[in-house]
């Protein structure tokens, strides 16, 4: 609704030339190797001090890291942290979206996530007799290395990245498109695509939505985007219906037998998926009791 105002501000940021897209290895863009790079716009500093590790106490990396208690990482040369809870699990439909846009050998795809076959070649496998919630894909740009956690799994000196220039470019592409400035929208979109080694394309809202989904996956913008775009009902209508289980059914002395199966725990359709009412939270009952003129949000 305020696309012109937004476009003006974002175009000023772009015209200032204070920021540019990081041109190092894309896989390092969120790691300690690329702290305070030219793309970082808002970043929290964390200090490498093993003698005061509790000052960096955080479960952030542990939650984002793979579900390590279900994995055999003995062949990985100790390069990955051995403690992870596996909360950051890419879905197959995200991988498929990458492949459709970039191909199986896509540069950004392969520096963003790894398939099970790829991760097993790095010495990380599902342990025999174990299973975890996963469709066979592992987030790579959020990998938790031992180097960045010298005092234990609860700490890391890798900085938090809250916003980077690629997000500004994609916001600018959207704002300019809605404001009628097609050439500026094209330029912003294709600056991101060029870094991803993709051909230029005309900026449409669908193209911008896709690019943002791929470029910023695992960076906590997706849910907010699909809420404001009013896409959540369509995209999340079946969320939670089935649970993917990646298992290694091999016995101790048997060759690995790893496969994904889907289990449906939720039979009642009212208990899973995004509904129209979820765009707004319910107003607490106490507030309604205190103010009889207040009406509850629809669906609650």
Regions found by a protein language model. Name each.
Residues 93-165:
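Flexible, polar/acidic helix-loop-strand segments at domain edges
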Residues 276-300:
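Extended, compositionally biased alpha-helical segments that mediate assembly or anchoring
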Residues 1-60, 149-165, 178-186, 198-204, ...:
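Structured, solvent-exposed acidic/aromatic patches
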Residues 76-78, 249-264:
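Surface-exposed intrinsically disordered loops and tails
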Residues 1-125, 239:
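An aromatic- and glycine-enriched ligand-binding surface/loop that stacks and positions planar moieties
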Residues 185-257:
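C-terminal structured "cap/appendage" subdomains that terminate the fold
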